[in-house]
Amino acid sequence: MESPDLEPQQRTLDDASAEVVSADEVEFDVETDVLVAGAGGCGLTATLAACEAEDLTVTLLEKSAEVGGNAALSTGMIPAAGTRFQREVGIEEGPADMARDILEKNGHEADAELVEHLCESSVDLVHWLVDDWDISLHLVDDFKYPKHSEYRMHAPPGRNGENLVAEMRDRIEARANAELLTNTPVTKLVAKDGAVEGVVAGSVREEAIRADRVILATDGFAGNREMVRAHCEDDIADALYYGSDGNTGDGIRWGAELGGALASMDAFQGHATVVSGTGALSTYAVVMNGGVLVNADGERFGNESKGYSQFAVDVVRQEGGVAYEIFDERIFERLQGALEDFDRAVDLGSYTSADTVEELAAELGCDPEATREAIESYNAAVEAGEPDEVGREDGRNVLSAPFYGTEVTGSLFHTQGGLVVDEHARVLREDGSTVDGLYAGGGTATGISGHGAAGYLSGNGLTTAMGFGRLAGVHAARSLGEQS
């Protein structure tokens, strides 16, 4: 019988508990040195890092048919401060600048030392991907995401995460000491005396795999509505989920069963501009090049430049959970051909155009006169160089005919809380001790976004996914090398 005084967070974890079995009850079928669970941004990076040790075997298991997870659904942009790509265009900044932006966005609610460590390692991460693994990345220097003080996003071709994960997958498949298996979910962790000794995995037929080190890269729990309702704010719990179906909290539950501490379980990344009719993502570059959002009454309802994650909740709170994105031909032409997400949205017929704001609003379904007044007020503030009626000052440009627009809804992308880890991505207990042999990264680990949606800075997801992934892979391989 459930204890009546059990904390709600623990109750949810217990109710949906993933199984951890004793090594005494398992007969292992195969062995590997490093086992990585989950082939998203974190798992792919961890595998690349670990398999650099050529005398080790590395096994990467993915529950879905395709690799990539949420990284494949993202723009694939990796923030890094102090790279040679920045210096080549005259940008002089360092990790401390990136850390400052992250901490200011999350209200200094994240672990400052961990934030600083990830920012310091971001430079090596980008250079390592490009130089050691021939991953195609370039600096994005034509627009900044909200609250980034400098151009520091390093993007794959097309600014599309599918292209990033495809290259990473190809590099792994070319390694003799690495094995990638899809449609192979990890179903249980195997442990003895609090230390991880392997996993049980498989869909049609399960096998027990002995592993000296296990890296949990199963992302968060945004695809598990029960966990979302238990931990995140009500407004987002029933919002559209725009993420990988495999993100059901498995790794978090396994780690917690072994005594791993949890933090920031209420943190998540939302997105304010998923197109209602087509389900396409209307890139936030539309907004940061001057686009605005109004509600059904034709009124601006908040400062869009505070970020697509935080603004997602504002959109969900509008009538019908929708808003209307208004921009112009200048923005349309600037983004077409530059971002694959935008091109996909265009190809799906996501956008409507008209010669006047009133005509556009009438077609979209928001109040024509009020929308015209909102755009006129916005333009006047831009021309005067003053904050507009919602306090926005960033990413503004005068909007002029012809106009474009679409109906959008707020969505949940992924959660940002999970297992507490150290600077090597090792899972920690409440007393600060490590769970032997166990690592976590990405959405499986505590993120750097503080609480709720407001603390998410663009790129935080891949910062923790790929940053912790590399740290975990390097440490796992190095620690095994020291034992040999």
Model-identified regions with their sequence ranges:
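Extreme N-terminal leader/targeting segments of oxidoreductases
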Residues: 1-34, 52-53, 481-482
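Conserved redox-cofactor binding core of oxidoreductases
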Residues: 11-12, 16, 118-208, 223-227, ...
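Core beta-strand elements of the Rossmann-like FAD/NAD(P) dinucleotide-binding domain
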Residues: 28-32, 204-213
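N-terminal Rossmann-like FAD-binding beta1-loop-alpha1 element of flavoenzymes
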Residues: 32-60
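Glycine-rich FAD pyrophosphate-binding loop
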Residues: 53-73
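A glycine-rich dinucleotide-binding beta-alpha-beta segment and adjacent secondary-structure elements
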Residues: 188, 370-452
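Glycine-rich loop(s) and the adjacent beta-strand/alpha-helix scaffold that form part
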Residues: 209-273, 462-465, 471
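An anion/pyrophosphate-binding glycine-rich loop and adjacent beta-alpha core
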Residues: 252-254, 260-366
